UniProtKB/Swiss-Prot annotation:
GO term, biological process aspect, one: commissural neuron axon guidance
Domain Laminin G-like: 30-258
Gene name per UniProt: NELL2
Signal peptide: 1-21
Its biological purpose: Plays multiple roles in neural tissues, regulates neuronal proliferation, survival, differentiation, polarization, as well as axon guidance and synaptic functions. Plays an important role in axon development during neuronal differentiation through the MAPK intracellular signaling pathway. Via binding to its receptor ROBO3, plays a role in axon guidance, functions as a repulsive guidance cue for commissural axons, helping to steer them across the spinal cord midline. Required for neuron survival through the modulation of MAPK signaling pathways too.
Domain of life, source organism: Eukaryota
UniProt-listed SMART domains: EGF, EGF_CA, LamG, TSPN, VWC, VWC_out
Positions of the EGF-like domain: 397-439, 440-481, 482-522, 523-553, 555-601, 602-637
Binding site for Ca(2+): 440-441, 443, 459-460, 463, 555-556, 558, 574-575, 578, 602-603, 605, 621-622, 625
Limits of the VWFC domain: 272-331, 638-693, 698-756
Glycosylation sites: 53, 225, 293, 298, 517, 548, 615, 635
Protein known as: Protein kinase C-binding protein NELL2
Disulfide-bond pairs as recorded: 401-413, 407-422, 424-438, 444-457, 451-466, 468-480, 486-499, 493-508, 510-521, 525-535, 529-541, 543-552, 559-572, 566-581, 583-600, 606-619, 613-628, 630-636
UniProt GO MF annotations: calcium ion binding; heparin binding; protein kinase C binding
Length: 816
């Protein structure tokens, strides 16, 4: 008991603290009339006395007006309202009798995010909104608000929960699709009208407010009961549970993947390495390759030219090249006969008698090398060559390179008469004097190429290439000429574009009747394609099933055109883009929905009490109806029972809630029909017979601003039935057949949902929280929850009443 009292106290304090006692928190309040700064200079409205004197009241007159919040003011409103799921609309009003008008409208282009409307034509209050699934919805609340009397109206929205209070009485309470307040930039706010031309409210408004808080209706009616928690609070708790469930599933999946990776890592050691000339180097390892310093970085070899220092050599040594190394090092020297020799160098000396003596620099002195004899030569003496480093002669053309040379990277060995020398390959330059090491010459950067105009020079190892620029073709290795891609059909123009050749390229221009950048051209239909039609050629629309016409503007009446054959117990009802076989009076659907109406079965009016037979007669059920029979020998009155009241046989009356319908009692049967319109009768009721109103002022302009309708005309616009009545357009939701099934889908460009058996095709489900799903990680999922399938990045799964439905997100795949 104590906990219940504490909870109630908390709810009262929480609900009241922001609303009254200290007044409404300004950060939660949008005072519309004050913020719009209506005054004497505002066309179409004027200040008048209100229900009370505490705030200003304004009369919205039957004249052209534009009561719209400025862009800055509207954005101030929306900053408070955007992405909020708990708010209340409050208004005190006195609406002119029979007027149908918009109280306030928040819309962007053709999308009504929040619009409150009162129809005096049909005696109902309507709320138009968009749900989180971006579908338009309309809730209709039958109530006479346009009666020239003062009323206080509040509409509280808490997530998917609506409560309508009128004059501090709860009139309606509903669960609906959750409204979306994700208002885009550029959204407009209108008061007393939908736009400049439609939805004019006529009457007085006072205290127009939006309170962004729970149970805002207590600001208008402090004595009303409060509920705790609100529907939005409950939705928040459910959402948190789903989020925690999703976090648990994702954490479990990450842990599983981490364990798998750890197991694999335990079995191997991975390190990025580099391989050069058969040798493998570890990450960050550096080495010298010829005349370059190289490093292994992230598995890639990066080399830079080696900068050789000048060695400071001691006495009896000098800088010299060493085999296998790029830079000079200090080597021992010998002085002999006025010349300098490096360690290991040899020199011959011939005596006066012609005897050859061979010396070698060793340990800083020239030492005698013992002769080991020379091989016999197979050439004439005149073709024998004396060498400076050997006492043995060789024949002309001797291959010194085959003995030994020090030619390294990009260098080749060449034979001279008496020795071998190194020479750089074509396209390379020497890195040192003996040409043992060479580097590539960048002919392109140094301008040492022969590429002519219309080409681009590309350097290659030891050479270069001349590449043709885009739009040119090759003449020879060094030159290119202009290429006509249009003639050779080597362009990227769309099939519905014209190709124009230019210097170095081409231009694409869409053909007349098509629009785009030339590479992509789409057909253009000047009047547009309505009802989901697609423009497939210039001013040619491909219409979806159920529509026809130049712009797909005409609904095909499948019922009158003979396309449909409904069961004898059903009537064919045409709908935009579709049709429906609706059970005739006296029949109802048995729950086994059939498109042709075969599921219609007889209603037992007698057993269910749905008959009008008076107490002195007996009801007999018939197929599709009933009969009121008088017992044998009894004199029956033939009276009827209608709405719980006795109507005498032959009596005629007008329905209380529909002044345009006339009913009569005939021998126990009640028959109702619309009033017959006699336009010749000067006293004809123009409300019931608007077609009898010839005044031009009673005509209406279609929402597109192009079509003019006479009073009484009807049409369908955006899944709403619209009617012109004495100059005012009133639209209400198109009546849809009852969908008695677990899964339903609203096809694109249609107005009414259809039943489907596959839950994965359904966009509307009768959620059953007792039906859960077990995902691939054995995690229990509630109905309505969604998750990314384990092991994937773009497969989204959803639990639908115990069924798991998965689909791949194409946009996610493109972003990978």
């Amino acid at each position: 008991m104590e906990s219940r009292v504490l909870l109630r106290t908390f709810c009262l304090l929480f609900g009241l603290g922001a609303v009254w006692g200290l007044g409404v928190d300004p950060s939660l309040q949008i005072d519309v009339l004050t913020e719009l700064e209506l005054g004497e200079s505002t066309t179409g409205v004027r200040q008048v006395p209100g229900l009370h004197n505490g705030t200003k009241a304004f009369l919205f007159q039957d004249t052209p007006r534009s009561i719209k919040a400025s862009t800055a003011t509207a954005e101030q409103f929306f900053q408070k309202l955007r992405n909020k799921h708990e708010f209340t609309i409050l208004v005190t009003l006195k609406q002119t009798h029979l007027n149908s008008g918009v109280i306030l409208s928040i819309h962007h282009l053709d999308h009504r995010y929040l619009e409150l409307e009162s129809s005096g034509h049909r005696n109902e209050v309507r709320l138009h909104y968009r749900s989180g699934s971006h579908h338009p919805h309309t809730e209709v609340f039958p109530y006479i608000l346009a009666d020239d009397k003062w009323h206080k109206l509040s509409l509280a929205i808490s997530a998917s929960h609506l409560i309508l209070h009128i004059d501090c009485n709860k009139i309606y309470e509903r669960v609906v699709e959750k409204p979306s307040t994700d208002l885009p930039l550029g959204t407009s706010f209108w008061l007393g009208q939908r736009n400049n031309a439609h939805g004019y409210f006529k009457g007085i408004m006072q205290d127009v407010q939006l309170l962004v808080m729970p149970q805002g209706f207590i600001a208008q009616c402090p004595d009303l009961n409060r509920t705790c928690p609100t529907c939005n609070d409950f939705h928040g708790l459910v959402q948190k549970i789903m989020e925690l469930q999703d976090i648990l599933a994702k954490t479990s999946a990450k842990l599983s993947r981490a364990e798998q990776r750890m197991n694999r890592l335990d079995q191997c050691y991975c390190e990025r390495t580099c391989t050069m000339k058969g040798t493998t180097y570890r990450e960050f390892e550096s080495w010298t390759d010829g005349c370059k310093n190289c490093t292994c970085l992230n598995g890639t070899i990066q080399c830079e030219t080696l900068i050789c220092p000048n060695p400071d050599c001691p006495l009896k040594s000098a800088p010299a090249y060493v085999d296998g190394k790029c830079c000079k090092e200090c080597k021992s020297i010998c002085q002999f006969q006025g010349r300098t020799y490096f360690e290991g160098q040899r020199n011959t000396v011939y005596s006066s008698s012609g005897v050859c003596v061979l010396y070698e620099c060793k340990d800083q002195s020239m030492k005698l090398v013992e002769s080991s004899g020379c091989p016999a030569l197979d050439c004439a003496e005149s073709h024998q060559i004396t060498l400076s480093h050997s006492c043995c002669k060789v024949c002309k053309g001797y291959d010194f390179c085959s003995e030994r040379h020090n030619c390294m990277e990009n260098s080749v060995c060449r034979n001279l008469n008496d020795r071998a020398v190194c020479s750089c390959r074509d396209g390379f330059r020497a890195l040192r004097e003996d040409n043992a090491y060479c580097e590539d010459i960048d002919e392109c950067a140094e301008g040492r190429h022969y590429c002519r105009e219309n080409t681009m020079c590309v350097n290659t190892p030891g050479s270069f290439m001349c590449i043709c620029k885009t739009g040119y073709i090759r003449i020879d290795d060094y030159s290119c000429t202009e290429h006509d891609e249009c003639v050779t059909n080597q362009h990227n123009c769309d099939e519905n574009a014209l190709c124009f050749n230019t210097v170095g390229g081409h231009n694409c221009v869409c053909k007349p009747g098509y629009t785009g950048n030339g590479t992509t051209c789409k057909a253009f239909c000047q009047d547009g394609c309505r009802n989901g039609g697609a423009c497939i050629a210039a001013n040619v629309c491909a219409c979806p099933q159920g529509f026809t016409g130049h712009s797909c503007e005409t609904d095909i009446d499948e019922c009158s055109d003979g396309f449909v054959q409904c069961d004898s117990r059903a009537n064919c009802i045409n709908l935009p883009g579709w049709y429906h076989c609706e059970c005739r009076d006296g029949y109802h659907d048995n729950g086994m929905f059939s498109p042709s109406g075969e599921s219609c079965e007889d209603i037992d009016e007698c057993g269910t009490g749905r008959h009008s037979c008076a107490n002195d007669t007996i009801c007999f059920n018939l197929d599709g109806g009933y009969d009121c029979r008088c017992p044998h020998g009894k004199n029956c009155t033939g009276d009827c029972i209608h709405d719980g009241k006795i109507k005498h046989n032959g009596q005629i009356w007008v329905l209380e809630n529909d002044r345009c319908s006339v009913c009569s009692c005939q021998n126990g049967f009640v028959m109702c029909r619309r009033m017959v319109c006699d336009c010749e009768n000067p006293t004809v009721d123009l409300f019931c017979c608007p077609e009898c109103d010839p005044r031009l002022s009673s005509q209406c302009l279609h929402q597109n601003g192009e079509t003019l309708y006479n009073s009484g005309d009807t049409w369908v616009q955006n899944c709403q039935q619209c009617r012109c009545l004495q100059g005012e357009v009133d639209c209400w939701p198109l009546p849809c057949p009852e969908v008695e099934c677990e899964f339903s889908v609203l096809p694109e460009n249609e107005c009414c949902p259809r039943c489907v058996t596959d839950p994965c095709q359904a966009d509307t489900i009768r959620n059953d929280i007792t039906k859960t799903c077990l995902d691939e990680m054995n995690v229990v999922r509630f109905t309505g929850s969604s998750w990314i399938k384990h092991g994937t990045e773009c497969t989204l799964c959803q639990c639908k009443n115990g069924h798991i439905c998965c689909s791949v997100d194409p946009q996610c795949l493109q972003e990978l």
